[in-house]
Structure formats: structure tokens, C-alpha cells
Design a protein with these regions (language model features):
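P-loop NTPase motor core
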Residues: 31, 106-157, 161, 311-396, ...
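Conserved P-loop NTPase
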Residues: 2-3, 7, 166-226, 324-330, ...
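Conserved P-loop
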Residues: 36-100, 105, 242-247, 251-314
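Pre-Walker A adenine-sensing motif
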Residues: 12-24, 228-239
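Short glycine-/polar-rich loops that comprise or flank the Walker A/P-loop
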Residues: 28, 55-58, 88-91, 134-136, ...
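Scaffold/interface architecture of coatomer-like assemblies
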Residues: 22, 30-37, 44, 48, ...
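Conserved nucleotide-binding/hydrolysis micro-motifs of P-loop NTPases
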Residues: 39, 65-70, 97-102, 138, ...
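Extended interfacial segments that mediate partner engagement and assembly in macromolecular machines
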Residues: 217-229, 234, 241-249, 257, ...
Length: 471
């Protein structure tokens, strides 16, 4: 028989926060919510209090030298979680400011005891020693400018430390949360993004792939997905392997978005729902083309990417939620350049690492991911991604322009497919009637990737001959 004490976890009801804590707040724990002014400390405390308080588990909110209760309530009631019916029934607000100004701490302690030990929330370090006997789950809210102040005596006494901060770079601001410690809980490490809206706080856990995080569809060993363009499937030796990530690179107007549309339409024909995060266009622009029919039919879900100062964690959260809702097998991110611009500047320095985590999680779910990237066509320099992210993709398809007989032509080639054979041809392609048509292979030319193919022998040999004649 085990004598181990089981710690009850109190569910806060804040989206993403309980997961961060490791399942909720430990009952009867003494916690500190710390951070800079305006970082969301009071809102976090109120949102938890309104979610957890009930007639059998009442809550007390003591104010000391901060905002007066009336002023604080005036602003907090703007949030949707604020429930007027709980005031004085399940929640009571007590102002201790006058007692503190008079310097009579004994009166403060006496008044706290008068309000009942079972629902006490404490606010100073000296009261921490009484927590166990009072059996109160307590949150102390304090303003601290530097994380180094966590070494103070209040933090030593605390069972849990929740640190909130605001990161500012230029005109961009991002809110971050860190569970510094939470005794008895397996909490998530690192800093995590959160947002405040009319509904209160929503936490977006830092994206780290774990096999157990999401269900993974089962595919056959050799199962492949059609791109919706038969000739491209042929160049891929039967289509793109299921669960792969594909990077489609090309200059502006080369047909990258058109290929994503073909990819999603093929999914609809095969009963494979899709999800698209379109950073190049607003939802209105996106839904004005062929994708509108896919969305209205329920075959494709659209992620709202128009919010400013996004984080990778927010985008991944929305993608995973939509994938699970749609039971999607195909995911499109159009494009990586637009994706980077949608991010807060604070996250752009780590864009490569963040993209790696995102792709790993999405493909780990068993979805097949198609990403597009703008190719700066310098012709003489072959660069598949301006971010150095080409290695993240399992397969790469390159689209380019070439000047041939005084005309700009489109060509396409399969650069790589990890662990699979593929065509090495460079083939003409065109867009006719809103459909991609892949034509014949370029034969009899050299220097194709330079953008200025030369009919016949090697361009380098011809140049050497011209130089020798010039002598």
C-alpha cells in the first residue's frame, strides 16, 4: 500500500496555460505572479480566480498598495471571463491599503484571518509560513523589473513562480510567459508566447515536437500523393511520398500558388482534406479565386494570418487545431517570405530554427506539407531558398524563367526527393486556362539554369572559342 500523497490540480480554464503548468495549479500551493508593469499579471490572476471560484471554493482578492478595487474592477469587467454573479457570492475583494499605510501589520494579519482560512490568498512573504495550516491556494502578485530578482526571499518561499514579460523591438511587442518553477509538477520549460484579447489571456506553448503530442495517420510504405499535375507526378516517379515536406521555389509569377491550388484540388478529388495558411493574400483575396469553392465545400480550411506580430507558436497552434478539425492530410504554407514578414521582428532572427520545428511537427502528424518560397532569380547563382532552409524540405521543385528566342519561357525541374528516384529533366511548363501544363524536355540546349540557354554545345566552350577568335 502506497502512502504517497496525491496533489490535486486546479484547472485554471485559461487556454494553453494548464498544459504549460503540467495539468493545472497544485492545490494549497503558494505562487508568485511576477513581471514588469503592464505585462498581464492582474488579468492572469483574475482570469484564474473567476474560472476556479464557486460557492464551495470561494476566493478572496486582497489589494494592498496597488490599484483600488473599484478602479481595478472597472477595467477587469471588460473581459468576457468577468462574471458579475460571482461577486460577493464566490469572490470577495478586500482593500488592505489603509492598514498598510498605518503600518499596523498585525491588523492586516488579523483581518486576513477573519475572512476565513479555507479561501485565503496571501500577499506577503511573512504569511507564506501559514499557508499549509490555512490550506489556501495563494497567488502573490508583484512587480519586478529584472528576472534576477527571482533570487529574493519571496521567491524562495514560493512553490510556483510565473514570470510575465514584454519584449519590444522597434514597433513590435510580444508577451512572454515562463514557468520558472512549479513544485510537484512536470511543467513545460522555456518561454512561451501569450496574447491578451477581449476573452482574456491565451497561451501558445513553444513548439517542440514529441511523438506523443499528436496522432499520426498510418500510410503505406510506398504510398504517394498526387500533386494534381500528372506530368509532375511522373517526374516524381509516381507522386510525392506521403508525409513529406515539399518546397516549391520560383520567381514571382512563375506559378507557385497555382501549383498549391492544384495540390489542394487533387486532395478534394481523392477525399484528402487540406489546410492552407496563405501569407501572400488576405482572406478576401484568397477566397475570390478557385480556392473559394474548396473552402465552401469543406474540403479546405483557411488559417487567418492577418494578425500583426505573430509568433511561430501561434501559427502552429492554429494549424494543428485546423488539421485536427479537418482531419487534413495536405497542408500548404504560401509563402515562406510572407510567413517571415507576418512574424514579429523578435522572432525573425530565429526563423530558420522555428521553421524547422514547425515542419517537424506538421510532418510528424502525418500530413504532407507543401511550402512555397520566392526565388531571387539571379540566373548565374542557383539558390533554392533565401533563408538557407532548403535542407528542411524532403523534396524540392524549382520553377524558373529562361529567355529563349526572344521570349520568356517557364521551366520546371525536380531538384531532390529524399530517399527516392526522380526525373533529372528540365521541362517547359505553362499556365493555360488556370491549369498547369508541363511540356517537353529541353533538349539541345546548354546553360539552361543560367537563364540564357544556348542551342547546341556547351556555352563555356562557345565562349572560349569567341575569346580565341578575338585574339
Amino acid at each position: 500500500m502506497s502512502n504517497r500523497v496525491e496533489i490535486r490540480r486546479l484547472i485554471t480554464g485559461i487556454p494553453g496555460f494548464d498544459e504549460l503548468l503540467g495539468g493545472g495549479v497544485p492545490e494549497f500551493s503558494f505562487n508568485v505572479i511576477a513581471g514588469t508593469p503592464g505585462s498581464g499579471k492582474t488579468t492572469l490572476a483574475h482570469q484564474m480566480m473567476f474560472a476556479m471560484a464557486n460557492p464551495s471554493q470561494r476566493a478572496l482578492f486582497f489589494t494592498v498598495l496597488g490599484e483600488p478595487p473599484l478602479k481595478m474592477l472597472r477595467y477587469q469587467q471588460q473581459f468576457s471571463f468577468f462574471d458579475f454573479e460571482k461577486i460577493d457570492q464566490s469572490i470577495r475583494f478586500v482593500n488592505l491599503a489603509s492598514d498598510m499605510v498605518d503600518g499596523d501589520f498585525d491588523r492586516v494579519l488579523a483581518r486576513s484571518n477573519d475572512h476565513g482560512a479555507d479561501s485565503l490568498q496571501h500577499f506577503v512573504q511573512q504569511l507564506g509560513m501559514h499557508m499549509t495550516s490555512w490550506q489556501a491556494t495563494t497567488f502573490l502578485i508583484g512587480e519586478y523589473l529584472q528576472p534576477e530578482e527571482e533570487a529574493g526571499p519571496v521567491f524562495t518561499v514560493a512553490d510556483g513562480i510565473i514570470w510575465l514579460s514584454q519584449l519590444v523591438r522597434g514597433d513590435s511587442m510580444v508577451r512572454k510567459m515562463q514557468i520558472v518553477k512549479m513544485r510537484g509538477m512536470s511543467h513545460k520549460l522555456g518561454t512561451h508566447t501569450f496574447r491578451m484579447s477581449g476573452n482574456g489571456i491565451e497561451v501558445f506553448r513553444r513548439a517542440v515536437f514529441q511523438e506523443s503530442d499528436v496522432p499520426r495517420p498510418q500510410y503505406g510504405v510506398h504510398e504517394r500523393l498526387s500533386l494534381g499535375v500528372p506530368a509532375l507526378d511522373e517526374m516524381l516517379c509516381g507522386g510525392l511520398p506521403a508525409g513529406y515536406s515539399l518546397l516549391v521555389v520560383g520567381p514571382s509569377g512563375s506559378g507557385k500558388t497555382m501549383l498549391t491550388t492544384e495540390f489542394l484540388e487533387e486532395g478534394q478529388r481523392r477525399g484528402e482534406p487540406g489546410v492552407i495558411a496563405a501569407f501572400e493574400k488576405s482572406p478576401n483575396q484568397l477566397l475570390s479565386n478557385r480556392l473559394n469553392a474548396l473552402v465552401e465545400s469543406g474540403a479546405v480550411g483557411v488559417i487567418n494570418t492577418r494578425t500583426l506580430d505573430l509568433s511561430i507558436d501561434e501559427i502552429l497552434h492554429d494549424l494543428v487545431a485546423m488539421i485536427e478539425k479537418m482531419k487534413a492530410k495536405r497542408v500548404v504554407i504560401d509563402s515562406l517570405s510572407g510567413f517571415e514578414l507576418a512574424l514579429s521582428s523578435i522572432f525573425r532572427d530565429n526563423f530558420r530554427e522555428a521553421l524547422y520545428r514547425l515542419v517537424a511537427i506538421l510532418t510528424g502528424m502525418g500530413t504532407t506539407v507543401l511550402m512555397t518560397a520566392e526565388l531571387e532569380d539571379r540566373y548565374t547563382v542557383l539558390q533554392f531558398s533565401s533563408y538557407g532552409n532548403a535542407f528542411l524540405a524532403d523534396a524540392i521543385i524549382m520553377q524558373r524563367y529562361v529567355e529563349l528566342d526572344g521570349q520568356m519561357k517557364r521551366v520546371v525541374s525536380v531538384v531532390k526527393v529524399r530517399g527516392s528516384d526522380h526525373s533529372k529533366d528540365v521541362r517547359f511548363f505553362d499556365i493555360e486556362g488556370g491549369t498547369i501544363t508541363v511540356g517537353r524536355r529541353l533538349s539541345g540546349y546548354s546553360g539552361i539554369l543560367s537563364g540564357q540557354p544556348v542551342r547546341g554545345g556547351h556555352a563555356s566552350v562557345r565562349r572560349r572559342k569567341k575569346l580565341s577568335l578575338g585574339r
